[in-house]
Structures are given as C-alpha cells and as structure tokens.
Amino acid sequence: MEKLTILLLVAAVLLSIQALNQEKHQRAKINLLSKRKPPAERWWRWGGCMAWFGLCSKDSECCSNSCDVTRCELMPFPPDW
C-alpha cells in the first residue's frame, strides 16, 4: 500500500510539473503574439497616401480617397448608401 501511495504522489508531481511547463510555454507564445502588430497597424504609406485603416482627417490623405472620420476606408461607399 505504501508503494502505491508513493507511486501516486510521484505521478501527481510529474503531472503538475508538466502542467506548469505547458502553462509557461503558452504564456511565452501569448507574449510573442502580443508583441506583433495587428494587421491594420502593419499597413504603411504608399506614395504619400495612407493605405487602408490608416489615420486620416480628410479624404485626400487616403489612397482610396475615402476617409471615414479618423480611418481610411478600403474603398469609398456609393453615395446612395
């Protein structure tokens, strides 16, 4: 009975060590991914105009020539929308 108890304790310790290692690995992966910029922030200026979802204050600043208050739109919406 003592051997079974010791075996169960060793198994519990090994499982908890494995769980801790997996948790650390997941945290490291999350930290790596959180350092990357989201796709909208990866766009850059092309030829003096701001690409999609870039910051803007007027239509002429956007490559699509469509500024929606603070961000460039992918394309202008038809006027009848």
Swiss-Prot record:
It comes from the Eukaryota. Keywords: Disulfide bond, Ion channel impairing toxin, Knottin, Neurotoxin, Secreted, Signal, Toxin. It holds the Pfam family Conotoxin. Residues 20-45 form a propeptide. One of its GO terms (cellular component) is extracellular region. Expressed by the venom duct. Transmembrane segments: none annotated. It is found in: Secreted. GO terms for molecular function: ion channel inhibitor activity; toxin activity. InterPro entries: Conotoxin. Disulfide bonds join 49-63, 56-67, 62-72. Residues 1-19 form the signal peptide. Its main location: secreted. Gamma-conotoxins may act on voltage-gated non-specific cation pacemaker channels (HCN). The presence of a 'disulfide through disulfide knot' structurally defines this protein as a knottin. The cysteine framework is VI/VII (C-C-CC-C-C). Belongs to the conotoxin O2 superfamily. This is Gamma-conotoxin-like TxMEKL-0511. The lineage of its organism: Eukaryota, Metazoa, Spiralia, Lophotrochozoa, Mollusca.
